């Protein structure tokens, strides 16, 4: 598939992007993690309701790497939930090809990092389905009251959006405002390591998606 090729598509109502462009996605040189439809970024499971311009987004692009990073963060949360279900994780800020995270109620140890990394690799190797479910704010408020869960609550409280996107994988779920990939297997290049009082969730660069770059000390960045 030609890099970043834009296509004008005509489709039947409620056709998923992943179904419409199945061949192009399979033939892509790099894993496809989302799409840009009529200038809006969409999940590959997004159901098209009209014809329009569509561009597949792979991980060899800045926006694709953002989706990669969000998906990896989701998987990291799922791995902690399986290994340390009581851990209160905070994603603090972005460094050079890494997210700096802390745990409010537990000490970060090397043993913990090894265990969580193994859980993450297991989730990635299984290429598990990640499903997006959109709720109204009222439905989301009722959901949080019913489940009494802290997952995604901070971000939820800070947003003013009328619609809330919850992402599910198996029995795990969390809230993300922007696009997350539809499968865990696209995030196969990563590392997690103890750093200061917290830890780093490291990932590749869109400049070279096949290697994990050496970590460099930098000022924190917005993510």
PLM features per residue range, with description:
Residues 4-16:
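Short, contiguous acidic and Ser/Thr-rich linear segments
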Residues 13-17, 68-72, 108-116:
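Short amphipathic alpha-helical segments
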Residues 13-27:
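Short amphipathic, charge-patterned alpha-helical segments
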Residues 21-24, 65-83:
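Active/ligand-binding-proximal structured segments within catalytic/core domains
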Residues 27-38:
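Short loop-to-beta-strand transition segments
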Residues 34, 46-65, 79, 88-96, ...:
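Auxiliary tRNA-acceptor-end handling modules of aminoacyl-tRNA synthetases
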Residues 38-44:
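Short alpha-helix capping/helix-loop boundary micro-motifs
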